Amino acid sequence: MGQTIRFGVSLDSDLLEKFDALCDERCYQTRSEAIRDLIRNTLVQQEWEDTGRDIAGTLTLVFDHHKSDLQQRLTEIQHDEHDLIITTLHVHLDHDNCLEVLVLKGPAERVRNLAQRLTSTRGVKHGKLSLTTTGQDLA
């Protein structure tokens, strides 16, 4: 981690008032920490757009395990991309529905493609990819 540098920011008073309200709502101790988080979030979003860069994330799927061959198709897709999958969690929500969470890490384009293949598989009721950074380039 580098040296901490102080710098000034000029803001419109209405914008500052809204920012202070956001800081209070999210329990930031200081404006500086809120600004650091905003900068980090912007840098992480930039990582997601770089298709060759490694990213991390989770893919959450909800599906009816009674659907013909669905579990087998999902497993085959996962085995095709096993190097992207760190771990999985399978939960029985009720008699019919399952929730599966995959923790993923790899090149952004491959992670997105895997998520798209799984969520678009016939029988999947809902799929949600949530991306984050590997943390390697953040201070």
Curated annotation (Swiss-Prot):
Gene3D superfamilies: ACT-like. Chain A, domain 2, Met repressor-like
Sites where the protein binds Ni(2+): H79, H90, H92, C98
UniProt keywords, alphabetically: DNA-binding, Metal-binding, Nickel, Transcription, Transcription regulation
Signal peptide bounds: none
Pfam annotation, one family: NikR_C
GO biological process: response to nickel cation
Note accompanying the cofactor annotation: Binds 1 nickel ion per subunit.
Keyword Electron transport: no
Any one GO molecular-function label of the UniProt entry: nickel cation binding
Keyword RNA-binding: no
Cofactor dependency: Ni(2+)
PANTHER family: NICKEL-RESPONSIVE REGULATOR
Family: Belongs to the transcriptional regulatory CopG/NikR family.
HAMAP family, A to Z: NikR
Function (record text): Transcriptional regulator.
Protein name in the entry: Putative nickel-responsive regulator
Protein species of origin: Oleidesulfovibrio alaskensis (strain ATCC BAA-1058 / DSM 17464 / G20) (Desulfovibrio alaskensis)
